[in-house]
């Protein structure tokens, strides 16, 4: 049991280190623009090209690496992230920095898909949602914690200090994985064609559409939350920052809660989630911008729902393609990214 818990902990922190590299740079884009003498739109490519790399690699890279020793694959991915982050510290021009961002992006879904698969396989089937929830907590923490830490480091020192932080975290996880993760050979590798054949199943495509819609419904609106709080609710900047932090922290709590709910009553959880989300948005539309206590309560509920959402999305594809876990988790990552992109575009109108 202790070894199992240690494995889940290392996987969760490993995912945190990957997401920390992806999301941590968001808050320091202006500093990157200043350091490399580019405009903010060009600096934004450090985020958008990374996300594009993840979306492209999602269905392919986990599939390609599914037959190799899982520990070796984890070390490869963490090694690539560490080397690229370390080289980014001394990157002399913006084009080189972009390359050093794009290369690890293609390995991002490999580690994340692997983490979900290994976590689910390390416990009894009925406990798999709880184990996966631990990994999603690492995802949420990477999105929430990475941004403020990198922001503080870059503001206190310079942009390169944030890159040192990214390299240090992935490097530490490389060492911990090497030392404490047992050898994880794939005893019965599944043929690539057999894994791809899951795409012939209509429920798989229904699950993909559901993930796109669910993730779009959460992040499509969340991406405009700061603007909503400023322009509609007319809140001061300090309070907006506090509410965004509360939302992020409750995402972590929601991930934990979502795992327990899916383990106990998966059908009810999946069916009620869209209804709860619709109700929340209706209340937000009707009175969220006028009543601060109601707005605060809705953001609390929204943060929890956001965490539950990630677990439901992974669960939907895992159920309909359980015989190809690495490939299905790669599809989940791609569908989630497409949902975020589509939701953001539609909500912007």
Describe the residue ranges of each PLM region.
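Conserved MFS/SLC helix-loop-helix module at the cytosolic interface between two early adjacent transmembrane helices
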Residues: 56-92
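A late C-terminal transmembrane helix in Major Facilitator Superfamily
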Residues: 320-349
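Helix-loop-helix hairpin linking two adjacent transmembrane segments in secondary transporters
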Residues: 96, 125-126, 130-181, 224, ...
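Paired small-residue
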Residues: 84, 95-104, 293-301
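Helix-to-loop junctions at the C-terminal end of transmembrane segments
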Residues: 58-69, 254-266
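Helix-breaking motifs and short loop linkers at transmembrane-helix boundaries and internal kinks
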Residues: 37, 69, 90-96, 287-289
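Cytoplasmic helix-loop-helix junction between adjacent transmembrane helices
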Residues: 100-138
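C-terminal transmembrane helical hairpin of 12-TM major facilitator-type secondary transporters
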Residues: 268-313
């Amino acid at each position: 049991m202790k070894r199992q818990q240690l494995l889940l902990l290392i996987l969760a922190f490993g995912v945190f280190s990957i997401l920390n590299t992806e999301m941590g740079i968001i808050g320091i884009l202006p500093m990157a623009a200043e350091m490399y003498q580019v405009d903010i739109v060009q600096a934004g490519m450090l985020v958008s090209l990374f996300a594009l790399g993840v979306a492209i690699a999602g269905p392919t890279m986990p599939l390609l690496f599914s037959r190799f020793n899982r520990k070796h694959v984890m070390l490869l991915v963490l090694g690539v992230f560490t080397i690229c982050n370390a080289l980014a510290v001394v990157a002399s021009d913006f084009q080189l920095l972009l390359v050093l961002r794009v290369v690890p992006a293609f390995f991002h879904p490999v580690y994340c898909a692997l983490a979900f698969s290994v976590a689910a396989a390390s416990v009894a089937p009925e406990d798999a949602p709880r184990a996966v929830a631990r990994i999603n907590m690492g995802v949420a923490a990477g999105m929430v914690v990475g941004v403020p830490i990198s922001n503080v480091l870059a503001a206190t020192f310079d942009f390169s200090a944030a890159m040192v932080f990214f390299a240090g975290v992935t490097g530490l996880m490389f060492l911990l994985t090497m030392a404490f993760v047992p050898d994880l050979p794939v005893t019965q590798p599944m043929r690539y064609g057999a894994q791809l054949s899951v795409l012939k199943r209509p429920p798989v495509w229904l699950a993909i559409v559901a993930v796109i819609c669910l993730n779009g419904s959460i992040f499509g609106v969340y991406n405009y939350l700061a603007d909503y709080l400023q322009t509609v609710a007319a809140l001061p900047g300090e309070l907006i920052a506090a509410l965004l932090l509360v939302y992020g922290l409750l995402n972590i709590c929601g991930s934990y809660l979502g795992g327990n709910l899916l383990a106990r009553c998966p059908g009810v959880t999946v069916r009620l989630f869209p209804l709860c989300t619709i109700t929340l948005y209706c209340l937000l539309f009707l009175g969220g911008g006028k009543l601060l206590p109601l707005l605060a309560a809705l953001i609390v509920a929204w943060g929890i729902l956001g965490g539950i959402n990630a677990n439901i999305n992974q669960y939907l594809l895992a159920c309909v393609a359980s015989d190809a876990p690495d490939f299905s988790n790669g599809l989940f990552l791609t569908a989630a990214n497409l949902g975020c992109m589509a939701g953001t575009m539609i909500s912007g109108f």
